[in-house]
Amino acid sequence: MIMASAESDIPTEMQDRGKWYGDAADYWKNIPATVNGMLGGYAHISPTDIKDSKQFLKSFLELPDECDEKTPAKVRRIEPSSTNDTSITSKIKPSIALDCGAGIGRVTKNLLLPLFDTVDMVEQNPAFLQKAKDYLGEKKDRIGHFYAQGLQDFKPETGRYSVIWVQWVLGHLTDDDFVDFFERCQLGLAPGGLICVKENITKTGVDMDSEDSSVTRSDEKLRELFAKSSLTVIKDEVQKNFPGELYRVKMYAMRPKS
């Protein structure tokens, strides 16, 4: 792993776009279609990851105080929401979510399907999506679409999504494609919809990983790119209780700038 200077806007390896994305695709073709494969040998952190993600996401959703998460949202009784958290401007009815960089569906199965009626999955590796159909079990019936496509090319259906969840995948996008992707995502949001990002962050600058053709950006750099994408961060939170040797992980909730 090479540390790129903060002044370097585009690491050299990212300048050949075709090779950059091709190398990443080749890397993931050789990764086992398992939770351990998706998490780089850290399958044991999955419950902790999901727990904090769920707590973060539920703060934005119209849900009863004690909901049966196995029951699709459309048949739950929704109580009027009330909150003193001024960072949450409105609650979202959890209808359809999009899981970006979905892999075999770990986040879809454990975070999104328990909260939403329907989930769409977008993942560049078709083999992972095929495995997802087994991994999800009966829950696969609530998958709206399986999109086998890289985020650099993906165009969400206009106005479809209550929430777009993007986790541990943005490092594969060049800065320009990062901005373009989030501009398209905004068109995919239903009225009042939300974009959530969960990513590793560096203390400063950009870390380059030539093995899997990815970068890890700083909080400052991510916010710079969010701003270029015309997104406003309305809430952020640091993931707790991960092993010390891992990157710091941060969650961001965003809405389009008004």
What residue spans do the PLM features occupy?
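Class I (Rossmann-like) S-adenosyl-L-methionine-dependent methyltransferase catalytic domain
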Residues: I2-K155, G159, L173-R184, G193-S258
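Hydrophobic adenine-recognition pocket in adenosine-nucleotide-binding enzymes
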Residues: V169
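A conserved beta-strand element that flanks and buttresses the S-adenosyl-L-methionine
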Residues: W165
